[in-house]
Amino acid sequence: MPLVNTTEMFRKAYAGGYAVGAFNVNNMEIVQGITEACGELKSPVILQVSAGARKYANHTYLTKLVEAAVIENPDIPIALHLDHGPSFELCKACVDGGFTSVMFDGSSKPYEENVAEARKVAEYAHKYNVTVEAELGQLAGIEDAVHVKEEDALFTDPGQVEDFVKRTGVDSLAIAIGTSHGAYKFKPGQKPQLRFDILEEVSKRLPGFPIVLHGASSVIPEFVKTINQYGGNMPDAIGIPEEMLKKAAKMAVCKINIDSDLRLAMTASVRKYLAENPAHFDPRQYLGPARTAIKD
């Protein structure tokens, strides 16, 4: 099965009341761990590349890794997606370079500018059967080149979503309901809360339309504990409870983005391995267990 766009994935997810996992990839071990797990589960998957990952690992290396994953896992649908594309130029480069889905992130721009740029991306991408995601509202937190202070974060205005989707022609919409990028999503002692009222209103205004949640890592406590046990310093890392993600998936969310959990899994595994095996220096010895941690 060749790379696919997200149209059929999201149609089935919406009808089935579940969300497709979208995982940020930076290297071979992450790609292998994710796709091996999804292959065993017979689950569709979105492998997404941020502008920072593309700069770090190179467009060609990443696309070839994903192509290899497609060959190794022929029975599952795999989409290759650009995460947080800040410009038409980058989105176009990814469309031209074999991506099957792109996100234009104009959430920091004035509304009309966001509309105009998203429409431009959609018009170009659709010529090549590439699906397009856009964003309304701004998530707090840090992810590669995306830096938004808590006081600058904005919840999505449900009153804008119909106009935005109609005028841009995008295929899915990322909204801000209280998730955030990074491993510090809530303050210590703060009860995790998401604005499900906004999600409900958006889904009413856009019936059947795929919604996306960014910044949705659970920040698995086991990984944080291991990192801190072996020399790390992440005392206040808090993520999104899994039950909230399941609830969102039953309310029109068809794509849930995961990045921090992958970083935590790899870091915890590598720290533990090197602490317990101080004489080892072959990267395969510690990256192999890290790959397994990603898969598990």
Name each model feature, range by range.
Residues 4-12, 27-53, 59-75, 84-210, ...:
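Alpha/beta enzyme core
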Residues 229-232, 240-296:
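C-terminal alpha-helical cap/extension of soluble enzyme domains
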Residues 78, 128-135, 279-288:
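Flexible, glycine/charged-enriched surface loops at secondary-structure junctions
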Residues 5-21, 280-285:
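Generic N-terminal amphipathic, Lys/Arg-enriched alpha-helix
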Residues 217-219:
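Gly/Ser/Thr-rich loops at beta-strand to alpha-helix junctions
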